[in-house]
C-alpha cells in the first residue's frame, strides 16, 4: 500500500496535462519494472503510454490506468477548501492520480493471485492510457488493436459512492470551424463589410434546428473561443 500511495501522491504533484504526462509515465514504468512486470514504454507510438504485463496463458485481464491532469485546478492535497499548490497551475480535479494508482493496485493483486496459481494460469496487463481529458487515446489504442489480446478489460473512476457500472458512452468528435470577416467603414461603406460573428450565429441557429432530428443518445455542444 505504501508504493500505491506514494505513486498517487507523486502523480498529484506532477499534475501533467494530456499527452504531456512524461514524469507520470516514467514513474509508472519504473515502479512496474521493480514489481516484476514486463514494461513497454513508450507504447503504441504514444510517448506517455505504457503496457505492463505479467503471467502467461488464459484468461488475459486488462486494467486501464489514466493519469492526466486539468488546467487551472492546482490544489494543495488534503485541503477541503480552494488552495492552489501552484498559482494558475494544473491539478487533478478528476482524481486521475487515484485512478492510475488504484488500477496499478488491482494489477498487483492479480499478479499475486497468478503467482499463487502458477505458470500458465493467466496474464494481467496494465495499460497506461494518457490523454483521457480530450485526447481520447484509448480510442486510438482500440483502433490499433491494442486491447484485442484481452479477454476482459476493466477500469474504475474515483467518486463519492461505491458502485459497478456498465453500458456505453458517446463517441467524442471535435471539429473546429474558423470564420473570417471583411472589414469596412461602418458609415462610409457598411454594405462592403462581412461580419464573421453573423456567420457563427447563423450556423448555431442551424444546429438548434438539427437537434430536433437527432436521436436522444446524440449530443452537440459548442464553444466560441475567440
Show where each model-derived region lies.
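Acidic/His- and Gly-rich active-site-bordering loop/insert found
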Residues: 1-92, 97-124
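Histidine/acidic-residue-rich, glycine-tolerant segments that coordinate divalent metal ions
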Residues: 48, 70-72, 81-91, 97-98, ...
Amino acid at each position: 500500500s505504501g508504493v500505491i500511495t506514494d505513486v498517487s501522491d507523486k502523480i498529484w504533484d506532477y499534475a501533467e496535462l494530456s499527452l504531456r504526462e512524461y514524469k507520470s509515465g516514467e514513474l509508472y514504468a519504473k515502479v512496474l519494472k521493480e514489481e516484476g512486470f514486463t514494461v513497454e514504454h513508450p507504447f503504441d507510438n504514444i510517448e506517455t503510454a505504457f503496457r505492463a504485463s505479467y503471467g502467461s496463458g488464459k484468461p488475459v485481464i486488462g486494467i486501464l490506468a489514466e493519469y492526466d491532469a486539468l488546467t487551472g485546478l492546482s490544489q494543495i492535497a488534503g485541503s477541503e477548501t480552494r488552495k492552489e499548490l501552484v498559482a494558475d497551475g494544473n491539478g487533478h480535479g478528476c482524481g486521475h492520480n487515484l485512478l492510475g494508482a488504484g488500477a496499478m493496485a488491482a494489477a498487483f493483486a492479480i499478479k499475486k493471485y497468478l503467482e499463487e496459481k502458477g505458470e500458465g494460469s493467466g496474464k494481467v496487463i496494465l495499460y497506461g492510457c494518457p490523454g483521457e481529458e480530450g485526447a481520447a487515446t484509448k480510442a486510438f489504442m482500440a483502433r490499433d488493436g491494442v486491447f484485442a489480446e484481452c479477454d476482459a478489460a476493466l477500469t474504475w473512476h474515483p467518486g463519492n459512492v461505491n458502485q459497478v457500472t456498465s453500458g456505453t458512452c458517446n463517441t467524442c468528435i471535435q471539429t473546429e470551424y474558423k470564420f473570417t470577416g471583411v472589414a469596412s467603414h461602418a458609415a462610409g461603406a457598411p454594405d462592403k463589410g462581412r461580419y464573421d460573428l453573423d456567420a457563427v450565429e447563423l450556423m448555431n441557429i442551424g444546429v438548434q434546428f438539427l437537434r430536433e432530428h437527432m436521436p436522444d443518445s446524440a449530443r452537440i455542444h459548442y464553444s466560441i473561443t475567440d
